Amino acid sequence: MASTRRPIAARLAFGLLATLLGALACSACNSAAGTGTTQAPSAAQLLVPSEQAAVAKAEADVAVHLPKKAGQPAPTLPEGAFPKPLRAHQVVGFLPYWEVGGLTPDYGSLTTLVYWSVNLGATGSIVHSGQGFTTLRSGALGADTAAAHAAGDRVLLTVFSESSSVINSVSSHPTSAGARLAENIAPLLSAGTLDGVDLDIEGDSTADRPGFVKFVAAFARTLRALGPGWTTMLDTYPTSAFDPLGFFDVKALMRYVDQLFVMAYDMQNPGIASATAPLANADLNDAATLAQYASVMPASRIVLGIPLYGYDFPTENKYDGSPATGNPVAVTYSEIVAAGRAPVWDPVTETPYTVFRRKGHWHQTWFDDPVSIALKSALAARYGCAGVGVWELGMAGGDASVTAALLGGSAPVKLPLRATRPLIGR
């Protein structure tokens, strides 16, 4: 889930097509390196017709003038950016263990607060160590839970693993491991008066795909038997709805969980200065991702994940889409704002970036700001999604414009605590 943990399936899927996109984006600047004023393809020009229409409508929903040329000053989100409020929707915010006690979220602007995380063990048990577990057992989350509930927000507990051996183990013994996880997590939910579970299991093996479905099914059924009303959310990759060889079988998994949180970020090509969460481009992007998900499941059960961080790329030159000269480094939105550099706009991906020199070398930092977040919120609304969510709340630095962009002029949907939809496929 964290910016340092790129979804492996998404990274592999990006591959060659992302490289070709980067070459397209920077071909003009490389051929006319003295100007940097070449007209870039619009976002809609790189999409299929249905996605073009969704992007165009989302852009129309946000009252901001979007530059049409690469490198022009990035717009800011004005008050009244949504002349017609977006359809009321959910807003999900992740609170990692290192933020507990040092961050006071705007609970009134949330639907669900998600505590990240405790770790999954190889047999389906909860690992009783690590800072996430220690913080939970200390009771430190109690104040956040009480405040969230007072504001009408659900509070979920994330179970996390990116260990290939652990994921293979639970997928190889899915029925027992799924039931054991539910039996292990139920006392933690009861003790913390929590409303359900978020499964952040980041696998990369096709071989584990069918077993993981059975694991989730066993978990969901057992949890509902132990505590009717506890909800289950599952985190998935941008590519999962259209990748038949990927770890997540979305069409099968959706039968057993209440919502999917689509981690629609870390879609950049590390070899080219590029957006981590493009609204649109030639390969991975939010518009194509939502279109694919909506084709295999009800959009009303999709939460579009939005990053509150970006990546700093050391680059060959200052132009949009320059090749990188080293590995990108994650940087939070609040850190980018604190740096005080004026952002410019990329009309292909509809995201901002900054260009600067450090110790004699060019750098580009690509990220999401209130305008690009507003466009994503509008796009999710156009697709009829349940809502939007962010990784993670502390990265915003308390910027009220980020909250406004997520809400889209509407009050957040508030869900009944410990209430959930009937289990399909039971």
Language model region names:
Residues 113, 199, 260, 304, ...:
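Conserved, mostly hydrophobic/aromatic
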Residues 123-139, 204-339:
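Substrate-binding surface in catalytic domains of secreted glycosidases
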Residues 27-32:
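Bacterial signal peptide processing site
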Residues 53-81, 301, 306-379, 404-426:
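Glycan-binding loop/region signatures in secreted carbohydrate-active enzymes
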Residues 1-10:
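N-terminal secretory signal peptides that target proteins for export/translocation
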Residues 36-187, 416:
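Glycan-recognition patch characteristic of GH18 chitinases/ENGases
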Residues 117, 182-211, 262-266:
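Active-site groove signature of glycoside hydrolases
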Residues 97-103, 138-144, 180-187, 240-251, ...:
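Alpha-helical scaffolding within the catalytic cores
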